[in-house]
Amino acid sequence: MKLLLLLLTVTLLLAQVTPVTKCWGKSGRCRTTCKKSEVYYILCKTEAKCCVDPKYVPVRSKLTDTNTSLESTSAV
């Protein structure tokens, strides 16, 4: 009986823990630091980072190439 009471108490305490805030269409989680396998592009309302798995982030356009500059293309 004591074991059952202990189990019930622990379960109720774990249920009261605040849930993690979701972001990026429920694919990301608001954290202060992201895991090594995650990236962030926006901030959450609590000024935490919205950590997202890179496979859920849209691919960046190849128009912004850092190796070319406007000066070299306009000199032609």
Curated annotation (Swiss-Prot):
<dbReference type="GO" id="GO:0042742">
    <property type="term" value="P:defense response to bacterium"/>
</dbReference>
<comment type="similarity">
    <text>Belongs to the beta-defensin family.</text>
</comment>
<dbReference type="Pfam" id="PF13841">
    <property type="entry name" value="Defensin_beta_2"/>
</dbReference>
<keyword id="KW-0044">Antibiotic</keyword>
<dbReference type="InterPro" id="IPR050544">
    <property type="entry name" value="Beta-defensin"/>
</dbReference>
<dbReference type="InterPro" id="IPR025933">
    <property type="entry name" value="Beta_defensin_dom"/>
</dbReference>
<feature type="signal peptide">
    <location>
        <begin position="1"/>
        <end position="15"/>
    </location>
</feature>
<keyword id="KW-0732">Signal</keyword>
<protein>
    <recommendedName>
        <fullName>Beta-defensin 121</fullName>
    </recommendedName>
</protein>
<keyword id="KW-0964">Secreted</keyword>
<dbReference type="GO" id="GO:0005576">
    <property type="term" value="C:extracellular region"/>
</dbReference>
<feature type="disulfide bond">
    <location>
        <begin position="30"/>
        <end position="44"/>
    </location>
</feature>
<keyword id="KW-0211">Defensin</keyword>
<feature type="disulfide bond">
    <location>
        <begin position="23"/>
        <end position="50"/>
    </location>
</feature>
<dbReference type="GO" id="GO:0045087">
    <property type="term" value="P:innate immune response"/>
</dbReference>
<keyword id="KW-1015">Disulfide bond</keyword>
<comment type="function">
    <text>Has antibacterial activity.</text>
</comment>
<keyword id="KW-0929">Antimicrobial</keyword>
<feature type="disulfide bond">
    <location>
        <begin position="34"/>
        <end position="51"/>
    </location>
</feature>
